[in-house]
Amino acid sequence: MSLSIDVTSLPSISSSIFKNKSSSTASTLSGKSIGRNELYVSPDAEAFNKYMLSKSPEDIGPSDSASNDPLTSFSIRSHAVKTNADAGVSMDSSTQSRPSSNVGCDKVDFSFNKAMKVNANLDLSISISTDQKREKSKKDHKNKKCYPKIEAESDSDDYVLDDSDSDDGKCKNCKYKRKYFALRMRMKHVAMQLIEDL
């Protein structure tokens, strides 16, 4: 059983990806350069026979005997690329095959080391004092005007009103005699003015 891959459908791959020396032998198919360690079989049966006889019987595998017809075998091999399990499509002669578990040649490091350091610690130098000075409150008491205390009691006992109104100018049990007489005089003037207006 042979595995054959059409080279014309493959993209152009540079040999520098694998970092190995390319072989001097190269064949160009459809404008794609492929470095190979092995020579392609020339399109004549004699060259194909020499190629087959140059190999030891132990090295001849199913891919070498793909067809009994030499021309058909050459047609198959000329459009095929040798492959192995580790490296996939062998585009270059490589003395060291890539392991299938770690494909280091195809790895691209997308990690970015950012040289940015953000310091989230903020030092706040704000101090709030809740202590209040009481010296001002003492001064405020001194600045307040001291009004004289109003005496509710009358100066003399002669002017005390009774429950019944009297016109003699004397009253009993009256605490606001001065305000009473002032209001009484004002009411008399208002009454006299109303009578005159009528």
Swiss-Prot record:
Name the coenzymes or cofactors required.
Mg(2+)
MF terms in GO = ATP hydrolysis activity; magnesium ion binding; nucleotide binding; RNA binding
What start-end ranges are recorded for coiled-coil regions in this protein? Answer: none
Instruction: List localization entries.
Output: Host cytoplasm
This protein's GO CC annotations: host cell cytoplasm
Main subcellular localisation: host cell
Give the source's domain of life in one word: Viruses
Q: Name one GO biological process term.
A: viral genome replication
Q: Which InterPro entries does this chain map to? A: Rotavirus_A/C_NSP5
Q: Which residues carry this modification: Phosphoserine?
A: 67, 154, 156, 164, 166
Keywords of this protein's UniProt record, alphabetized? Answer: Glycoprotein, Host cytoplasm, Magnesium, Metal-binding, Nucleotide-binding, Phosphoprotein, RNA-binding
PTM annotation, UniProt? O-glycosylated. Hyperphosphorylated on serine residues, when in dimeric form. Phosphorylation by host CK1 is required for the hyperphosphorylation of NSP5 dimer.
Output the Pfam families linked to this UniProt entry: Rota_NS26
Q: How does it assemble?
A: Homodimer. Interacts with VP1. Interacts with VP2. Interacts with NSP2; this interaction leads to up-regulation of NSP5 hyperphosphorylation and formation of virus factories. Interacts with NSP6. Participates in the selective exclusion of host proteins from stress granules (SG) and P bodies (PB). Also participates in the sequestration of these remodeled organelles in viral factories.
**Role description:** Plays an essential role in the viral genome replication. Participates, together with NSP2, in the formation of viral factories (viroplasms), which are large inclusions in the host cytoplasm where replication intermediates are assembled and viral RNA replication takes place. Orchestrates the recruitment of viroplasmic proteins such as capsid proteins to these factories. Participates in the selective exclusion of host proteins from stress granules (SG) and P bodies (PB). Also participates in the sequestration of these remodeled organelles in viral factories.
Provide the protein name: Non-structural protein 5
Annotated organism of origin: Rotavirus A (strain RVA/Rabbit/United States/ALA/XXXX/G3P11[14])
